[in-house]
């Protein structure tokens, strides 16, 4: 599966939105990839996550003990990707604003891959790496369905992206004129 295949799946699900959006990262964009519209279709989600699992297998020679997803956005893709990898799926969730591996215990040295939905700045992955390190895990890599940075983001561990698709995003004080006149919508899940 390549980038165009991923974009085609998002188009099939009517999941590429145009307007003025405040992303989960806090950055602004004229394009929003509404993965919830994709993830509501099990067949489309299965295709994407099977493709991601194949890329993970090609990239990581070591055995993987767990796939871990950051809640909320990483729950569905981490679960479905773990199914294709044949390993358990766990998740981290925010407690007082900080990710924790709250509902699970893992052995020290457990080899994990973080799976996220869409990466813009990589903050959720970096925070997940910190939570897993605190739990004693070895993070082999992270992976995502779509890297909006076009391969430029640094998450602190290797990032395996099913698709790299650079979509412009802006700091709130650096909006282009055409975007600044549109009302902003915040569809993300960071504060949930």
UniProtKB/Swiss-Prot annotation:
Its pathway, per UniProt, is:
Pyrimidine metabolism; UMP biosynthesis via de novo pathway; UMP from orotate: step 1/2
Which keywords does UniProt give here?
Answer: Glycosyltransferase, Magnesium, Pyrimidine biosynthesis, Transferase
One GO MF term on file is: magnesium ion binding
Cite the binding residues for 5-phospho-alpha-D-ribose 1-diphosphate. Answer: 116-124
A Pfam family reported for this protein in Swiss-Prot or TrEMBL: Pribosyltran
Question: What EC number(s) does this enzyme carry?
Answer: 2.4.2.10
Binding, orotate: 120, 148
Q: Which SUPFAM superfamilies match?
A: PRTase-like
The protein's required cofactor(s) are namely: Mg(2+)
Q: Which reaction does it catalyse?
A: orotidine 5'-phosphate + diphosphate = orotate + 5-phospho-alpha-D-ribose 1-diphosphate
Example GO biological process: 'de novo' UMP biosynthetic process
Q: How does it assemble?
A: Homodimer.
Which family is this sequence assigned to?
A: Belongs to the purine/pyrimidine phosphoribosyltransferase family. PyrE subfamily.
What is the role of this chain?
Catalyzes the transfer of a ribosyl phosphate group from 5-phosphoribose 1-diphosphate to orotate, leading to the formation of orotidine monophosphate (OMP).
Protein name, as recorded:
Orotate phosphoribosyltransferase
The organism encoding this protein is Bartonella tribocorum (strain CIP 105476 / IBS 506)
What is this protein's gene name? pyrE
């Amino acid at each position: 599966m390549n980038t165009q295949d991923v974009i085609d799946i998002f188009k099939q699900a009517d999941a590429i939105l145009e307007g003025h959006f405040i992303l989960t990262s806090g950055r602004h964009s004229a394009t929003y990839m509404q993965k919830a519209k994709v993830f509501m279709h099990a067949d489309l989600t299965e295709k994407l996550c099977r493709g991601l699992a194949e890329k993970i297998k090609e990239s990581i020679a070591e055995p993987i003990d767990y796939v871990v997803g950051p809640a909320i956005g990483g729950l569905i893709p981490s679960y479905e990707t773990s199914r294709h990898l044949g390993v358990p799926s766990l998740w981290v969730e925010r407690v007082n604003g900080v990710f924790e591996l709250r509902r699970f215990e893992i052995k020290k040295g457990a080899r994990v891959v973080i799976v996220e939905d869409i990466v813009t700045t990589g903050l959720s992955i970096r925070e997940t790496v910190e939570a897993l390190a605190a739990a004693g895990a070895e993070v082999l890599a992270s992976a995502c369905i779509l890297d909006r940075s076009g391969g430029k983001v640094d998450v602190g561990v290797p990032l395996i992206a099913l698709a790299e698709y650079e979509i412009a995003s802006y700091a709130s004080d650096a909006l282009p004129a055409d975007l600044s006149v549109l009302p902003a919508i915040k569809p993300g899940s960071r504060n949930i």
